[in-house]
Swiss-Prot record:
Subcellular compartments: Cytoplasm; Nucleus; Membrane, Caveola; Cell junction, Focal adhesion
GO CC terms, sorted: caveola; cytoplasm; cytoskeleton; cytosol; early endosome; focal adhesion; glutamatergic synapse; Golgi apparatus
Cofactor: Mg(2+)
Activity regulation as described: Phosphorylated by MAP2K1/MEK1 and MAP2K2/MEK2 on Thr-203 and Tyr-205 in response to external stimuli like insulin or NGF. Both phosphorylations are required for activity. This phosphorylation causes dramatic conformational changes, which enable full activation and interaction of MAPK1/ERK2 with its substrates. Dephosphorylated and inactivated by DUSP3, DUSP6 and DUSP9.
GO molecular function: ATP binding; DNA-binding transcription factor binding; identical protein binding; MAP kinase activity; phosphatase binding; phosphotyrosine residue binding; protein kinase activity; protein serine kinase activity
Active site: D167
Protein name (record): Mitogen-activated protein kinase 3
Amino acid sequence: MAAAAAAPGGGGGEPRGTAGVVPVVPGEVEVVKGQPFDVGPRYTQLQYIGEGAYGMVSSAYDHVRKTRVAIKKISPFEHQTYCQRTLREIQILLRFRHENVIGIRDILRAPTLEAMRDVYIVQDLMETDLYKLLKSQQLSNDHICYFLYQILRGLKYIHSANVLHRDLKPSNLLINTTCDLKICDFGLARIADPEHDHTGFLTEYVATRWYRAPEIMLNSKGYTKSIDIWSVGCILAEMLSNRPIFPGKHYLDQLNHILGILGSPSQEDLNCIINMKARNYLQSLPSKTKVAWAKLFPKSDSKALDLLDRMLTFNPNKRITVEEALAHPYLEQYYDPTDEPVAEEPFTFDMELDDLPKERLKELIFQETARFQPGAPEAP
């Protein structure tokens, strides 16, 4: 299968084209939309794809593999948060090996720590992403089923490594012309830790609001793998209707969208909310009745709606797991537990990155990328 790059720190990006590309001269650095890409001589013929908060993505011709690739130019070193996300993504993707998770083919950077201003991450080139695809067409049930299977197949691997993606959304699902799908953008990923404290009621959370599980907004600790399943449920609903199911404008609006469809939580579900302020807020709201999925999606496959219901369950303890979702009747034609690999061992971060200064994070990025430098020993 093929793989690719998404615009760092952002969603879709602009359509691919030759605008802003300066023709290459041997020995010179190519410039894309004013940005120098110091990636020669192996990578040439750059074309702009898109850009995000702290970098730009271009396609390029790889003279070794004889194919076009995607190159992310990341310039994160002025900001602790960008350094943190860059390091986390590199750490995870260099250790992951799965057909439905984006891989890293190569990393280019300056030969010394002092000279390192940018990092170039080379990945397989994908033609589009699910966000762009849903903007342009209504998917058939067959396509929805196949894309959902691949999302869950990749997520099974991620979760088996004890990692939460935490930012699953259509623009982070890359797709090529043969409908292969790869999950990308692991900058917000974390080790699954149900006991880690996430302080505060309705404090700002970095992942895209529309795909956030309700417990993220309501609890101060207890994030589990079920938050990713909620996001996949939101993505399935969006594939069925070509519009986001919970497009909240802010926190409380987001909760109101969710409760407006799922109905008021039961007393048992309220009991799983450990934050008393949040629980009291929910109990103060007028009672709401659940809306039938078939009413929202009258033309959709009934098995798809049953799986959707099991994913978009308010109580994370009752939400379907990724293994259970793969075995659901809706995905029967693809389900093959012998071809749904898991990680060889749980992923562990050597240290908590949140508290490290950007200078230390830069050193760690330099170390993590050393294996790609000329003369470095082959990676295992």
